[in-house]
């Protein structure tokens, strides 16, 4: 009688016991999967259905802290991802599609300041990249197309004034480039052609007086 009562008490626990790391007759991953480091600590844990990751996957550093969290959708082809420092603060956040970076990715310092924002398409930089000072002020804007610099490139001083204006065309610097002093006066300017300085480049003092002229076509 005691054995019967003990068995009946164990039934609820047995019913909720999940096996892990299983594949079906077709070799497809099903249910909960876990992997560990050589030291025995958990590397990741998540769930599969017909070999496709589903729901939330948790990834860990070998020392035990949470490293990343991925929320899978679209039959496991896309994952909203958050990556963490060991202190638990957010390091990066963005989207993976078919295991490639896609859309907007943001990167943060260890004290939670946004340091960079990038736009991706199919794993390549595509769109605007913004870089920030540790104060949070904008430092740089650069445009990309299919993984190469293409379009306007602008840098700023800490106070928000423009520091430099330039441009890229197919990964090469092209057209006019201007550098400024912190007071807003032009430091120097000139042209780029095929990623090389071209023609006349003129340098100025902070008072706006022409100081040096160089001709790169001679």
Residue spans for each PLM region:
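Bacterial Sec-dependent N-terminal signal peptides
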Residues: 1-21
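Glycine/tyrosine- and acidic-biased, solvent-exposed loop/turn segments at the edges of beta-strands
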Residues: 16-218
């Amino acid at each position: 009688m005691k054995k019967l009562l003990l068995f009946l008490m164990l039934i609820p626990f047995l019913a909720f016991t999940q096996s892990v790391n299983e594949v079906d007759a077709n070799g497809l991953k099903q249910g909960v999967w876990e992997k560990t480091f050589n030291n025995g600590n958990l590397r990741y844990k998540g769930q599969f259905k017909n070999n496709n990751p589903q729901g939330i996957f948790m990834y860990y550093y070998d020392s035990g802290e949470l490293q990343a969290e991925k929320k899978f959708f679209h039959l496991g082809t896309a994952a909203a991802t958050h990556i963490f420092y060991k202190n638990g603060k957010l390091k990066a956040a963005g989207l993976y599609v078919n295991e490639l970076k896609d859309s907007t990715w943001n990167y943060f310092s260890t004290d939670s300041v946004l340091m960079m924002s990038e736009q991706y398409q199919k794993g390549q930089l595509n769109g605007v990249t913004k870089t920030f000072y540790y104060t949070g002020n904008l430092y740089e804007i650069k445009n990309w197309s299919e993984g190469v610099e293409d379009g306007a490139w602008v840098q700023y001083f800490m106070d928000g004034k423009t520091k430099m204006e330039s441009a890229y065309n197919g990964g090469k610097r092209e057209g006019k480039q201007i550098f400024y002093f912190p007071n807003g006066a032009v430091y120097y300017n000139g042209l780029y052609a095929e990623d090389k300085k071209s023609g006349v480049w003129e340098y100025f003092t902070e008072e706006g007086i022409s100081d040096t002229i160089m001709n790169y076509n001679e």
